């Protein structure tokens, strides 16, 4: 039965869900209500009082619109719809009073505050406040707290909205922040002066409506109006979080989240947010050719000529790295297969079936987790592999979902049923008749750590059997942003990585820095950073990073998304697709496209669903043939969240965070 209620907001009658709060109803009616503490993804605190409205026929004082539901309003004496006024003299006076209280102890140091220009307090003081103040006493001051290397604190600016406290406890799942004291003595602090132990902590910077919490790495580097803003996609994990990259000149200055309810909501991980300093360190900005055992700078003509000479008439293998766009992977496939070679993207050894999209991707969407009543994790630690997805699993747990884990025990920020450590536990539950689960919304999530061992195909088959027996949605949680798109483009070889490089005389390494290539083959490395792959190379071709070229990326649920260029590659580095196009001409096998748009058209002709941007194609369920796995314990794919790719390894901030995380594990706080 519908619970729709009629309500009049500023002379406009609307029909809304009775469970809505007044502030949500006003938004439905197109009326903007100022707020500081209210946030639609956090619990309601009702402590800033900026959202006051007048309820006609209700209490004689203004009501907090964030805390009152539409169903609580009384109709008129003859059954008329309740009336709410958001701009009456009573409301204006109330807002002026609240704003005056807000500014009593605020230092008003906007010229030196990093929040200046994008500050809610500035905007609302201008729109709803008075031009002066009656307060003449001394302002209070509060000691700053040390939250770690990411979040800078100026707690005298704090207005006690408690958004940061609610985010850390409700979304991030840590209890290190809280509010102490009352009235003028109230302050936000951390438990025993601990630094924050969460890989989502940077989101409190966005949530803070004032300049109390700001970014330490970004401090005093730019003003918002000086920055060029580009909407693009993150590649630090396979979730495909929507981000905004802000640049000044040729440099990336900061990375912020964009809202996408189906992917990352409005959160991003700390690696996504703070990895930008790695974009300008250890960069490859000129081609290199190895001469007499040493890498020497070369021109593009010399480097491409050396590669073409090495490849002609030889057995060539191509490797697709974790941060490569789908167009670049497809271009490499066309180039290498045109020379009679093979291409492989499963560089971690994952036993994913190239011909079965339901097997290497699954059938679940990220949003399916929201409504799940039971979630079974197999060989995955989502807190390390996809922190934003883990926050969504935590939200499902808060809403009553039961979580199960097959794998080593880990702190996932929520309670779970530990089914077992090893493959035998998976085989056991896959063979059971779990009757009640068939009538529930259930999701089975398997991680890359479970699929990279020799029996990965058998583990996958058991997980798919479990999903089939329980009528669950199935999700393969990838860790590489490029993996799904490359598999869609057909960058797979029979026998996987070993089959691709077996007997290869030339290995063309497109950004695969996690692979150890044995001595013997001639190695060409095309990538953005001087990392492991470049050290082994005989020729280095400097390419663009993910912020420096357009490209398609397909996330772990199969959603194609378009990344846009926010900056330009340094020095003589080129876009990856352009390098491969130039090399094809050098080989005398010129590809039939000479622009990225032409390349993308060819890709979409071969793989039509990649043209449906931001749409998740439905996969036909096809269970892999059942096999018996070994008996060893399942391992996790990510050992160090902060150092999983060459950009992160080049980042000073990520190195510091990695060291802090290791120190915490080595010396946990004693219980007292």
Named regions from a protein language model:
Residues 598-672:
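Long, low-complexity segments enriched in small/aliphatic residues
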Residues 2-27, 35, 39, 55-58, ...:
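N-terminal export/assembly segments and adjacent metallocofactor-ligating motifs
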Residues 51, 66:
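Acidic, glycine-enriched active-site microenvironments
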């Amino acid at each position: 039965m519908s619970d729709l209620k009629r309500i009049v907001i500023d002379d406009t009658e609307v029909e809304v869900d009775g469970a809505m709060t007044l502030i949500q109803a006003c938004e439905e009616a197109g009326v903007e209500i100022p707020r500081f503490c209210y946030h639609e993804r956090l619990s309601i605190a009702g402590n800033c009082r900026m959202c006051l409205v007048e309820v006609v026929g209700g209490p004689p004082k203004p009501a907090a619109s964030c805390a009152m539901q539409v169903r609580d309003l009384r109709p008129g004496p003859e059954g008329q719809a309740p009336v709410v006024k958001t701009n009456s003299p009573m409301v204006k006076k109330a807002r002026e009073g609240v704003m005056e209280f807000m500014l009593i102890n605020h230092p008003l140091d906007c010229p030196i505050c990093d929040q200046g220009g994008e500050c809610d307090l500035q905007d609302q003081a201008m729109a709803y406040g008075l031009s002066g103040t009656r307060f003449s006493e001394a302002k209070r001051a509060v000691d700053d707290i040390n939250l770690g290397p990411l979040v800078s604190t100026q707690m005298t600016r704090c207005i006690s909205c408690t958004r940061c406290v609610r985010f850390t406890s409700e979304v991030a799942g840590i209890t290190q922040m809280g509010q102490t004291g009352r009235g003028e003595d109230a302050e936000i602090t951390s438990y025993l002066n601990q630094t924050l132990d969460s890989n989502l902590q940077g989101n409190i910077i966005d949530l803070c409506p004032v300049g109390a919490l700001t970014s330490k790495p970004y401090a005093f580097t730019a003003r918002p109006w000086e920055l060029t803003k580009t909407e693009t996609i993150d590649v630090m994990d396979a979730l495909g979080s929507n981000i905004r990259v802000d640049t000044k000149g040729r440099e990336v200055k900061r990375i912020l989240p964009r809202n996408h309810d189906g992917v990352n909501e409005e959160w991003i991980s700390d690696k996504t947010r703070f990895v930008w300093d790695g974009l300008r360190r250890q960069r490859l900005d000129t081609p290199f050719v190895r001469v007499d055992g040493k890498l020497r700078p070369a021109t593009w003509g010399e480097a491409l000529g050396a590669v073409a000479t090495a490849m002609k008439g030889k057995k060539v293998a191509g490797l697709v790295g974790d941060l490569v766009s789908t167009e670049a992977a497809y271009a490499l496939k066309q180039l290498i297969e045109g020379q009679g070679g093979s291409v492989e993207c499963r560089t971690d050894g994952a036993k994913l079936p190239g011909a079965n999209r339901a097997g290497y991707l699954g059938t679940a969407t990220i949003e399916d987790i929201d409504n799940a009543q039971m979630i079974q994790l197999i060989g995955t630690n989502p807190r390390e592999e996809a922190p934003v997805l883990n926050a969504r699993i935590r939200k499902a747990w808060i809403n009553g979902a039961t979580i199960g884990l097959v794998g080593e025990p880990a702190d996932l920020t929520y309670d779970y049923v530990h089914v077992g450590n090893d493959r035998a536990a998976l085989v056991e539950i896959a063979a059971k008749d779990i009757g009640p689960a068939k009538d529930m919304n259930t999701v089975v999530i398997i991680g890359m750590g479970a699929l990279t061992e020799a029996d990965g195909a058998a583990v996958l088959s058991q997980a798919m059997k479990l999903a089939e027996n329980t009528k669950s949605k199935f999700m393969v949680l990838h860790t590489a942003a490029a993996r799904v798109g490359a598999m869609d483009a057909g960058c797979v070889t029979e026998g996987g990585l070993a089959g691709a490089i077996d007997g290869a005389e030339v290995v063309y390494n497109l950004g695969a820095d996690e692979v150890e290539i044995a001595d013997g083959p001639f190695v060409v490395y095309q990538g953005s950073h001087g990392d492991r792959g470049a050290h082994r190379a005989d020729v280095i071709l400097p390419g663009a990073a993910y912020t420096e070229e357009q490209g398609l990326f397909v996330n772990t649920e199969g959603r194609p998304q378009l990344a846009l260029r926010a900056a330009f590659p340094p020095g003589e580095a080129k876009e990856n697709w352009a390098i491969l196009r130039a090399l094809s001409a050098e080989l005398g096998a010129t590809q039939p496209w000479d622009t990225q748009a032409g390349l993308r058209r060819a890709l979409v002709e071969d793989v039509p669903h990649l043209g449906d941007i931001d749409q998740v194609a439905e996969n036909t369920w096809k269970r892999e043939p059942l096999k018996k796995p070994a008996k060893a314990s399942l391992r996790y794919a990510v050992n160090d969240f902060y150092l999983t790719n060459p950009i992160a390894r080049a980042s000073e901030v990520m190195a510091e965070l990695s060291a802090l995380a290791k120190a915490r594990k080595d010396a946990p706080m004693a219980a007292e």
